[in-house]
């Protein structure tokens, strides 16, 4: 009989791995990804200026384990912020500034192209015509659609190829600054 000894295996130990470098994009994307939706249901007027109260509803499902629990969104917003119509127009303009820039290869990436298509073709945006030709109630609806569409477009980057254009890297920061609650 031939007996061969097998070498004893070393006991495996737990190893904690922490990221040594994180993407500058991860913070704004994580923030935007937590937003379920926004609503603009109320306004206030101060010194003749209308402020739109943005109700921000966050996603609360933190577990990745499938359950039969309902992940329904609360009736109450997680926080509210106030913005003027010009703040919405500035958001649109700042996103446009980065999305319309010439890319290295001379063509627009898919990410920036989605924003440009929306900015050029959608009627639900903060434009001068909307401000002058509509009432506050209609503007609330249009601005709600605008904000929710921009959040969806900012997060659509997960589905696109890895782009290194300035719009791809900057637009999420612009969006985060607009929707972040000032403390």
PLM segments and residue spans:
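Intrinsically disordered, low-complexity regulatory regions
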Residues: 1-183
